[in-house]
Amino acid sequence: MTATVSPRPDAADAAPGPGEVVSAQEQARRGGDPARWPEKLPVRDRLSVLFDSGTFVEDGLLATASDARLPADGVITGVGRVQGRPVAVIAHDFTVKAGSWGELTCEKQIRILERADRDLLPVVYLVDSAGGRLTDQMGFFPGRRGASAIFQLQVKLSGRVPQLCCLHGPSAAGGAYMPAFCDWVGMVAGQGSMYLASPRVAEKVTGERTTLEEMGGAMMHAAVSGCGDEVFDADWEAVAAARLLLSYLPDDFRGRPPRREPVEPVRADWDELVPADPNVSYDVREVVDRLVDAGTFFEIKARWAQEMVVGFARLDGGVVGIVANQPSVRSGAIFVDSADKAARFISLCDAFNIPLLFLQDVPGFMVGVEVERQGIIRHGAKMIAAMASAEVPKYTVVLRKAYAAGYYAMCAPGFEPRATLALPGATIGPMSAEASVNAVYANKIAAIQDDAERAEFVAARTVEQQADLNLLRMGSDLVVDAVVPPEALRAELAARMVDAEGWSRTPGRRHHLISPV
């Protein structure tokens, strides 16, 4: 149904009566004509997916009521309940000037963020905006209550309350930073995009010809840039995922995620799931499936930096953040992007009081000219600093191998995990026994002419090196706290996590922001 456009009232017009006010509210609630975008779920239907039925209370519905072309000034703001918990929302209405921002669009967003800051409410952003409304640029751009104030408030809220974003359409120019400041970004395939300049502008500036999907589309940001966390086929799926993710997070930095009734894992059979040969790959998600409550693993940034797997899960009913090396991708080595991915997730868990579980199977940080030029040391330091500074309970499990600085970055004993556990076949050391022999005896090996003699020498030295990496030695020297059969690992972790439920932060320590990737 197409909304009727009323003429702008003149100053000489009589004051509107009650019926006209009600009519104006109804017209504002209808918004524009969604029939022009049949592939999109109307914005108020998105809100129906997000909130418990009948709980949404809206603010500012009559914004720009004097101009019927701008119902609610293109944005819906207010507070509703998600599983009984109050949550603030900013939802752009794509049927009103493509969701673009004017002066009152900014004012409404600022006010709801100020309320979220005051009342410590989680915020969900349903973004679908062409950016600033250039016909109102003096209203939305330069002043104290313009777009910059929105970003200021987002940063202020970072680490204080969860901020989740569903990207249903464009998020253009400066507006692209709205999702970038959020803790999680779900993007709708073929619709969601974020970019600082359109392909047309990019061509004028740089001369390169590209498409919107290639430069700022959902799959690009989820798999290449790391700005997106997941890609969804439909609007409702993205909103439903945000609603689910809220169940893993507390209302604010002072609380803890709600516990649920424990559920047995989806799989219990290990059957040599972790191969003894360190050169044979496996999917660490199969390990996760055997440790956590069935159906509870919520992976973060699954398409980006896939050599590192991170996500939320429930273990015996309690929420835990998982940081795991992925042997099936790049042998689980840590690269620049995977270090950033882990660092941000660790910071997110620490901000919201979620214990961390590190699953180690790591050959170390990647080496070579390319990664050194990319700043692997700097990015690795970012990951180590995030892990070392996290005050939440940390638990480390060495699944198979833990070598070099990768062992440190994945929460080695010196970084004060509550416990360091190991499966029976695990090895720990500066490098593998074979690599150690090549490093220590390189000249001597090269000097042996006879092939058989050389092989015998290398084999003997390798056995010697393996003695130092032996897990019995690690247990004897108290490097590991316990060697646990895989079938008993879930129960062991659950018992240790329950024992640490009374943990508290350093007195006087305040919340910290969650730095963008």
Predicted regions and their residues:
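Ligand-binding clefts of soluble mixed alpha/beta catalytic domains
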Residues: 1-517
